[in-house]
A protein has these predicted regions:
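N-terminal ligand-binding/catalytic initiation module
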Residues: 1-134
Length: 134
């Protein structure tokens, strides 16, 4: 488990304890309800193919009435734990401002600086197609 993820889980547990929230409810909030892991095969402009790892984390829908909120990023540093940690952060942000939304976040592990704009477009579309049934 990454440092970011362990820190945010620890903070949620501490806040739950301070607020005297039932431990079972705290655990429902701590863990993501769904993490989708994808392998995206991109066809480059020159005909080569590359494999990219990608994730989408739906953190918590305990307070959600209207679905999930959260974007995605493309970076060579993206990984599963970071994606889950960022989705947890989004859950907390929406709760703090009173939005009836759970937190979500997504990411593609790729360096967009090494891709053409058409390749980035294709990669994002591949990602979106993989998410469509979910």
């Amino acid at each position: 488990m990454s440092t970011e993820l362990s820190v945010i889980e620890s903070r949620i547990r501490n806040a739950g304890e301070l607020a005297n929230v039932d431990e079972e409810l705290v655990e429902l909030i701590v863990k993501p309800i769904r993490v989708l892991e994808m392998s995206l095969i991109l066809r480059h402009d020159d005909g080569r193919h590359s494999l990219f790892s990608a994730w989408r984390a739906h953190h918590s829908d305990v307070l959600a009435v209207d679905g999930m909120k959260g974007g995605f990023r493309i970076s060579p540093d993206v990984n599963r734990d970071e994606t889950v940690a960022l989705s947890a952060g989004m859950t907390l942000k929406t709760a703090l401002v009173g939005l009836p939304l759970g937190g979500a976040k997504g990411g593609i592990c790729a360096d967009p600086k090494t891709l053409t704009s058409r390749e980035v477009d294709r990669l994002v579309r591949l990602y979106a197609r993989e998410l469509n049934p979910h």
